[in-house]
Amino acid sequence: ADVVIAVVGGSSARDFKTTYKETGAAIADKSQISDMECGEGFDRATLSLLGKQLELLESLKSTRKPLIVVYIEGRPLNKNWAAEHADALLTAYYPGQEGGDAIADVLFGDYNPAGRLPVSVPRSEGQIPVYYNKKAPKCHDYVEMSASPLYSFGYGLSYSTFEYSNLKVTQQAPLHFEISFDVENTGKYDGEEV
């Protein structure tokens, strides 16, 4: 193959073999571990990929072929390794029954992606939980890493580029503002700016 596409992450599929405590937490022993890693009753202490998925990615990267990593997830997973080593990274969340077709359309260039992250993706578990109304201290990082998210709320890429101009802000009332601007697609491909 010219390119390696690795799909990693987890599942929220109910396998109906899992039993639950009164609190809703899943009961599983080593012989009967569900592949479900997200959803009601499946809290996790880590954002890491489960099982040997990271080892798989490292092995695939060692082939020296371009590596595209697609994350299927219901919560932000640790993407630090992929952000540093993969040639492309796509977060698909749980895309539903047509998700495979939609992912293929993006990867093969039949659709120009326009989606943006609905959450910030942390670099580490130490950055969560995130309170969106909490102001971050100025110039305060962790000892071993930046305090900024790996990918911020609203981040996303496209095969197109866009230019903004003619920004106008008009105050309509004490707490009511109207904002307008022009958006121009300056890229080679048709696209949507979200």
Residue ranges, per PLM feature:
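C-terminal non-catalytic regions of proteins with extracellular/luminal or membrane-system context
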Residues: A1-V194
